[in-house]
Amino acid sequence: MNLALAATEVERRRVPELSAGYNSYSKTWEVIVQYQGDLAFLEEQGVRVTLLLFSYAILLVPESLMDYVTELPQITYLEKPKPLFFADAFARSVSCISPVQEEISGLYGDGVLLACIDSGVDYAHPDFCASDGTSRIALLWDQTIPGKPPTGYALGSVYTRQQINEALASSTPEERFALVPSRDVTGHGTAVLGIAAGNGRSSADAAMRGVAPEATLVVVKLGNPDPADLPRTSQLLQAVDFCVRYALLVERPLVINLSFGNNYGSHSGDSLLETYLNAVSNLGQNVICIGAGNEGDTGRHYAGNLKSDRKSSGQTQTVRATSDPAATSAVSATADRAVSVEFQVGAYESSFSLQIWKVYGDEISIELISPGGIRSGTLSPVLGTARLTLGPTELLLFYGMHPPTARRRKFT
């Protein structure tokens, strides 16, 4: 504050940090204060007072009264406001994108297909239109709208750039959605695509553009006609297949963004979805990007090594899972040296799924103990499904063969 008061008006105009809060026309300063007592008397002296909670206030002070106000015993602390910036204003530079978009390299995505497999897109958003108002979206496949699926697929409806342009030329939103009825209800896909490829036409001087503002776009809205159903991995596989096939057809390099995911599987890359993604990533020139980190601290997964008694006793170790802390210690002390694996189930959860994956060659047996202490007995590792009742809890069990490429076997 002292530095701003000492600076000239020319210096303040050149440095936003110095000019923040100063009005050169009214010669007033806006300041933030913490105070004690009553500040009502300041209104009579030409100071506008806006009282906040917990003895904070915003003052609009004539420049001639600044020294007087700062010396008041009622003012515990005074602070000059600071300019705010959009938090994403520097996202491109801190992601090291700006250097590759300088005049020498000019890598803005021209000639590249960028596919967004998500919740859809607001195709009328200016960031996804060229300067002449036509769409940058080559294909839009909405899997939730039955009727006109792409060739080779059996769900949803696909819309071409020509159809989207006809919709954009409509005079009303009602006419537009009658031609191309796809909507991004949640807005997630639109936001993701804006980060990846928005051209900034909706912001002044294209300041808020995405990473590849000149890329050609392919959009797939995952889902079902029933909005209550969640998208499935089978639909995700078809979406990726659709995008890769189109890129091969038009002979363009392709980048696919996937922001969907789940917590199933052994996380060893052996599921059919994972092996398929690995396989198609080698076709043509394509890069598949997935979201990560949203559940990094939720403890959804656990891995560990169980000590084997085979060398000392020749016995196969028994592993028991329990949600009862009291039962845990009792099980751990049994004669066959069982290991307790505790898992938590919230009181509000009426159902949930738990998968246990083991190395294929290892032999284990499992006993479940309910919160009430009811034991299932040793569950035999017999392939197939079984049903079990532990008090009020119904269990549906499955012991499965490992997939052809897997190194682990699962018990669900």
Model-derived features: where do they sit?
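Subtilisin-like serine protease catalytic core
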Residues: 102-234, 251-252, 285, 299, ...
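Stable alpha-helical elements in mature extracytoplasmic
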Residues: 65, 124, 188, 236-239, ...
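Substrate-binding/access-modulating region of protease and related hydrolase catalytic domains
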Residues: 224-332, 337, 348-376, 384-387, ...
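Short strand-edge motifs at loop-to-beta-strand transitions and within beta-strands
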Residues: 57, 339-341
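Autoinhibitory N-terminal propeptides
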Residues: 1-55, 64-104, 133
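Short hydrophobic/aromatic beta-strand micro-patches
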Residues: 34, 60-62, 357
